[in-house]
Amino acid sequence: MKFIKSSHSDKVLGNKLGFSAEYKVNKDVTLCAATDGVGSKAILAAELKEYKGLGQDLVAMCSNDLLCNKAKPLFFLDYFACSSVKSKQYTEILKSITSACKKINCSLIGGETAEMPSLYRGNHFDIAGFLVGIKENHKNLKISKGDLIFGIKSNGFHSNGYSFIRDIIKKNKIDIKRAIFNKQKLSKLIMKPTRLYHQLISNNDLRYIKTLSHITGGGIYSNFKRSIPKGTKFDLKITTLPREYDFIKDNINITDMELTEIFNCGIGMIFIINKKNYSKFIKRNLFNLIGEIT
């Protein structure tokens, strides 16, 4: 929508990657801002009355986008909307948000709570987050043929694909509260919180990383393409899917390629480095070499 740009000053650097937007305060300071929610994972949380990881989902959806701009989180605000505030639900979500903020050295400085019984029913609610960070002063590194593509493992489905998951549960009449999958409660598997990648990638690491891609809605390929120049050729090898994807495949006819267009498929963050920096990352837990720029 072009009319939005009419509100911009010359300090707005834009949102070229589509992950977070940049605003140049002065020659030394560039701020980045991101906003997101947890989608229909909130509906499952309400049905299961399981909220302890949902605040981390919210913070991670914003902070992982911010990381793609090589920014360090500064402060976070939340928005909570419901029919009426229920103490356990509200408190557990806020505690989870607070805990996640502390994990990435970010301050929860405020928020808004809205009670709207005409819009929300029963236990249902929605949450949104707003995060501001400061961009680290790193050189822009050009992507070249032979560069290596690394993936960092996800922690389950993160916060995307839940409309699809809920549809599977409904059509197959699965009792989500009692179902067991791979020797654990299915509800526990499905509600794992989104990983906070600022905990795994340091400011020093960013000196060697050319681009980062947060793998969210739309899956692996579409999100990866957002972080590289149009027309860049690459080879990605997504070989073995995590066990939780057997739950999807056992209950609906879907190909692995179709899964990569919806889910993170076990990879929550992708980044590119020069091959000479291979040894700096390959031995790390959760890090895997998954491809190459061709």
PLM feature spans:
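N-terminal glycine-rich phosphate/pyrophosphate-binding loops that anchor nucleotide-derived ligands
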Residues: 1-67, 105, 117-118, 151
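Glycine-/charge-enriched secondary-structure boundary and capping motifs
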Residues: 2, 88-107, 120-125, 175-190, ...
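A generic local secondary-structure boundary/capping motif
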Residues: 12, 21-23, 64-65, 98, ...
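Acidic, glycine-rich active-site loops and adjacent beta-strand->loop/helix elements
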Residues: 37-39, 79-87, 112-118, 133-136, ...
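Flexible, glycine/proline-enriched loop segments at strand-loop-helix junctions
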Residues: 49, 82-88, 148-156, 185-191
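A glycine-rich phosphate/pyrophosphate-binding beta-strand-loop-alpha-helix module
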Residues: 49-126
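A structural signal for short, well-ordered beta-strand segments
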Residues: 76-78, 129-131, 269-271
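Phosphate/diphosphate-binding glycine-rich loops and adjacent basic-rich segments that engage nucleotide
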Residues: 121-124, 130-179
